[in-house]
Structure formats: C-alpha cells, structure tokens
C-alpha cells in the first residue's frame, strides 16, 4: 500500500517489522527476497522519490533507443507496493535514526509543513544508494547527471529538439557508455577526463588505448589529460538573450599537468556546448549512518560484515551502492539478488550459509568495442599480456603470489558480412 498521510503511516507501521530506506534496485530486491519467504512480516519502504521500479543500468542506453522514462518503469511505486503488500512512504525524507529506541524520524517532501513523524523498526535495511559527485567546477544548476530516472527524463526532453553538442565530464564506465549512446542518437559528443584514456582508473594503458581508439573512430571527441575548471552560461551578462547561444554553456578546461619550461603554452579555446553531463563518480551521504552510529568509510560507504551484511549497529543492515565489503564499494547490480537473499534469511532468523561475495563480471555496454573484466581490477599492478592481436587483447593482473586477481578481455566488434 502507498501512504500519503504520515500520521496514517505511523499507525500503520506501529507493528514495527522491517523498515527499508531507499527504493532503488537494492531496496526492492530486499522486499522481493523477504516476501518470497514470509508474506506476513510488516515492511515499510521509505523513499524520497516515487518509488517506481526500473532498471537503472538501462539509463545509459535509453536515449539512442528513444525510450522515455515511462518506457523504463516496470511498475509504479504504488503498484509495486500493493503487489508486495508493503507500506510505501513515497516523497518522504528520513531526517534521523535512533538506534537505541529503534525509531526513524521522517517528514514529507511533498507537503509544505515540516512536521516529523516517528516510525519504529525491529530490523532496518539501509538501501539509500550513492549520489553523484559534483566538483566545484561543475555547478549542479547547470550540469546534468543520469544517476536517477527523473533527471534522465528531464535531460531526454531537452535533447528531443534536434542534434546538440554534449560534453561529458568523466570517462569511467558510465561516462563512456553515455557518450556512445548520445552519439548514436545523433548528437555531437565531447568526452573529457583527467586521465589519458577512458577507464584508466581500472585498466592498464595498453588496454585503455584500444578503448580510446574505438570511441574516437566513432566520432566521439576525447580530451584526455584535461581538467574542467568552470562551466558557465555563455550569456550570463544578460545581453543577447535572443541569440542562438542564449542557452549554451561554456566549458573552460586546461591540461592537468603543464610543462613549466614551456613558455609558449597558449590558453585553450573553451568549448561551447548545449549540455554538460557529470560522470565524475559517486559518494554516499554520511548523515544517516552517522546518526545511527553505523561504521562508515568516506571513500567506500557503510561498512558491513561480509557474511551477514549487518552493520556494527544492532539490527541494521546495508545493501547496494551505499555499502562496502572488506574496504571495497559494492556498486554493481549483479550481486544484489544474493545480497538481498542473505539479508532476508538473517532478518527472518533462517539458517543460511552466509553471503559469499564474488566480484561480478564487468561489461562495458559500448558497441564500438567489447570490454569484459573479471576479478578486482586496478590500473596499477603487474598486468601481463596473455593474448594480443589486432582484434583481441587479453591481460591478467597478477598479485604478489603470481596468482591472477583480474582479467580484462578486449575484442574488436565483429564486422557484419556483406
């Protein structure tokens, strides 16, 4: 059930049960796992948005496929809540967690008053995800992100007016995937990164050089080794607002490192673009974990026990983008089902063998080049070539004991037969 009135929600949740904070893939996976084993235990799902169910990884492929946000939604939040028989508090912000009384304070984001409502819990699952990092040079009022379906929908609407020039800052997996998607949709794309090649924080130079060549061969402009210093409106002075440039943005950038002995270095001409997308990484909000006394790592998120996904705070679990295992952030979709099953068993008091975390296979969704990674990759390290040809590169990352800790396989796309 979906509840608009928080006073009703408080009485509905008076039976306590399970409270889940966050209605992304992780939160809904936990609900699915619990309901598969117990149809009676009360579950309250709290989310700052509508709680609609959709597959977030599809956002980096949807524009070229001409898919609207409504096409990606599998079920509205209220529909999904009714099906699962859970209490959904949509458009609701959690302001505090008291681990002693096992209560949360919430308020509505859809109503003008700031009245707080208290909801109790027996078990809590933090599934609040991670949010985009915006460096000071990328003001949020001018720069897009595609980490949420609502912002994706707003950007897509802007891109329907015809071919436009989009600058993407950050050439990790998401930025590189979005670049190809926008190009296929007919837009001009400039991809900017601090590193010399895409995916440089996870793969060695020999591998990333092939990715650079592939995306540039498509027509994507890649600016590697550059840092964006500012994004501003072209006509912030208020003049010429009727010109074609009225809504355009100026992107100032410079080489990350310059040769101090080179006195001939000239300032670079800024880019003039229609839109800027930030793909500069994710971070986890520390406020709620701190309030709950949950151990937190500012780099990787909420710290959990590897076998049970419990935090150090009694009766509180974490799952998905907001949590980390053994110092490594868990920001991939593939493990969510197994993580949710472990949490469900632990909450319900069922015997279970414990969660066995295995790094998921990572696939770049670009069609220009096939990139597949297994293990735990990192750019620095003892990477050894296993296979190398014009069409294929396979490299292994060896640890100190000469054991393989990661493998990257890069293949050129198959050429269609005439």
Predicted segments, located by residue:
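FAD-site-proximal beta/loop scaffold in flavoenzymes
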Residues: 141-162, 264, 269-338
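Residue-level detector of alpha-helix initiation sites
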Residues: 24-28, 50, 132, 150, ...
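Rossmann-like NAD(P)H-binding beta-loop-alpha module
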Residues: 154-203, 207
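Mid-to-C-terminal Rossmann-like scaffold of FAD/NAD(P)H-dependent oxidoreductases
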Residues: 3, 13-16, 322-417
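Beta1-alpha1 glycine-rich phosphate/pyrophosphate-binding loop at the start
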Residues: 3-86, 181-202
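A Rossmann-like FAD-binding core segment of flavoenzymes
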Residues: 42, 83-115, 119, 185-304
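Short beta-strand/turn micro-motifs composed of small residues
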Residues: 22, 47, 170, 193, ...
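FAD-binding core/adjacent interface of flavoenzyme oxidoreductases
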Residues: 2-21, 74-165, 169, 250-270, ...
């Amino acid at each position: 059930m979906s509840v608009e009135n928080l006073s009703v929600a408080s009485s509905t949740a008076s039976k306590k049960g399970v409270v889940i904070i966050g209605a992304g893939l992780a939160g809904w996976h936990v609900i699915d796992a619990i309901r598969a084993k117990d149809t009676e235990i009360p579950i309250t799902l709290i989310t700052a948005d509508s709680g609609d169910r959709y597959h977030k990884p599809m956002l980096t492929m949807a524009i070229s496929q001409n898919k609207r946000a409504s096409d990606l939604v599998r079920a509205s939040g209220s529909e999904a809540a009714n099906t699962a028989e859970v209490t959904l508090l949509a458009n609701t912000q959690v302001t505090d967690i008291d681990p002693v009384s096992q209560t949360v304070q919430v308020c509505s984001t859809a109503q003008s008053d700031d009245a707080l409502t208290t909801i109790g819990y027996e078990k809590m699952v933090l599934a609040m995800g991670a949010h985009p990092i915006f460096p000071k040079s990328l003001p949020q009022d001018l720069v897009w992100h595609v980490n949420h379906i609502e912002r994706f929908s707003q950007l897509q609407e802007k891109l329907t007016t015809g071919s436009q020039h989009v600058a993407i800052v950050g050439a990790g997996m998401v930025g590189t995937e979005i670049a190809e998607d926008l190009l296929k949709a007919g837009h001009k794309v400039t991809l900017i990164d601090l590193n010399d090649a895409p995916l440089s924080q996870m793969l060695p130079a020999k591998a990333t050089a092939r990715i650079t060549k592939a995306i540039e061969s498509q027509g994507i402009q890649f600016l590697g080794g550059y840092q964006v210093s500012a994004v501003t409106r072209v006509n912030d002075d208020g003049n010429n607002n009727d010109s074609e440039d009225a809504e355009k943005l100026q992107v100032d950038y410079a080489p990350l490192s310059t040769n101090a002995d080179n006195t001939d270095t000239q300032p670079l001409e800024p880019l003039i673009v229609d839109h800027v997308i930030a793909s500069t990484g994710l971070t986890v909000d520390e406020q709620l974990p701190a309030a709950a006394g949950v151990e937190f790592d500012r780099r990787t998120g909420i710290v959990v026990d590897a076998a049970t996904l419990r935090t150090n705070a009694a009766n509180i679990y974490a799952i998905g983008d907001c949590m980390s295992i053994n110092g490594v952030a868990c920001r991939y979709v593939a493990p969510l089902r197994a993580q949710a099953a472990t949490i469900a068993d632990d909450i319900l008091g069922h015997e279970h063998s414990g969660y066995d975390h295995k790094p998921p296979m990572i696939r770049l969704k670009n069609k220009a080049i096939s990139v597949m990674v297994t293990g735990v990759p990192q750019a620095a390290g003892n990477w050894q070539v296993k296979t190398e040809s014009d069409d294929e590169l396979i490299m292994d990352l060896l640890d100190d004991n000469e054991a393989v800790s990661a493998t990257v396989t890069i293949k050129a796309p198959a050429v269609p037969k005439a």
